[in-house]
From Swiss-Prot:
Species classification: Eukaryota, Metazoa, Chordata, Craniata, Vertebrata
Functional pathway: Protein modification; protein sumoylation
GO biological process, one term: meiotic gene conversion
Coiled coil: 91-124
Protein name: Probable E3 SUMO-protein ligase RNF212
Length: 297
């Protein structure tokens, strides 16, 4: 026991044969003084109290009050070091986890940036190829792309066909393919100011309503300008030459007979049944496609 410990009543220091006790009010008594006072009452402050015998088996928290400062510093320094080491180990573990997570996220970000750059490069090349194809399609010499939303009568109104006979055209007909002049060539999907197109020459043919499903009748008659409409394409064929009004025997051919098709335009399928627009110079016919013919008859 420390040398500063003594009895608070008789002031005698502890020795081998004496025992000291501690009250909960903080006073120390030797056995002799403790026996002289009342039970459960402090001799100094007269307050109700409880006493604890000071020995090697006393609680460590109580023994700490009688230890030297150096011993207490060493004890608490050691405990503090253990606490610091424990906390530091867990901090390092948490820090290692976050570093690994950050490394994975940085790698994922790097891959994402690389993928975005590749996609942008592919997009740029595809846009270049698309622009090239678009420009090549828009500059085709035979035909033009018509907008799908425009109607057939509007396109027919914007196109004038010149089929008046001339010596030059007669010589061309005798040689083979016929030519028609279209006043107003294509502009913004419409036929605009002057386009000459070559078509297959089939003399003296007129297209009429098919009596048998899947077939169309082509008979000898006045020259006609035929527009064949299917769900995907608009086919323009020019049947010219010959004398007007002369009729001979009819000839039945399968639909889409083997005829040279000179000009193709994208077009939407015409609604309704067979529509015919006639002028003094030309007969324009809108037959349904083969699939619709089979359904209609």
């Amino acid at each position: 026991m420390a040398n500063w410990v003594f009895c608070n009543r008789c002031f005698q220091p502890p020795h081998r044969t004496s025992c000291f006790s501690l009250t909960n009010c903080g006073h120390v008594y030797c056995d002799a003084c403790l026996g002289k006072g009342k039970k459960n009452e402090c001799l100094i402050c007269k307050a109700p109290c409880r006493t604890v015998l000071l020995s090697k088996h006393t609680d460590a928290d109580i023994q700490a009050f009688f230890m030297s400062i150096d011993s207490l510093c060493k004890k608490y320094s050691r405990e503090t070091s253990q606490i610091l080491e424990f906390q530091e180990k867990h901090r390092k573990r948490l820090l290692a986890f976050y570093r690994e997570k950050i490394s994975r996220l940085e790698e994922s970000l790097r891959k994402s940036v690389l993928q975005i750059e590749q996609l942008q490069s592919m997009r740029s090349s595809q846009q270049t190829a698309f622009s090239t194809i678009k420009s090549s399609v828009s500059t085709k010499p035979h035909g033009c792309l018509l907008p799908p939303h425009s109607s057939a009568p509007d396109r027919l109104e914007s196109m004038e066909v010149d089929l008046s006979p001339s010596p030059i055209r007669k010589s061309e007909i005798a040689a083979g393919p016929a030519r028609i002049s279209m006043i107003s060539p294509p502009q913004d999907g419409r036929m605009g100011p002057h386009l000459t197109a070559s078509f297959c020459f089939i003399p003296w043919l007129t297209l009429s309503k098919p009596p048998v499903p899947g077939e169309c009748v082509i008979s000898r008659g006045s020259p006609c300008f035929c527009i064949d409409v299917c769900p995907h394409w608009l086919l323009l064929l020019a049947f010219s030459s010959g004398r007007h009004g002369e009729l001979t025997n009819s000839k039945t051919l399968p639909i889409y007979a083997e005829v040279q098709r000179a000009v193709l335009f994208p077009f939407q399928q015409a609604e309704g049944t067979l529509d015919t627009f006639r002028t003094p110079a030309v007969s324009v016919v809108f037959p349904l496609c083969q699939f619709e013919r089979k359904k209609s008859f």
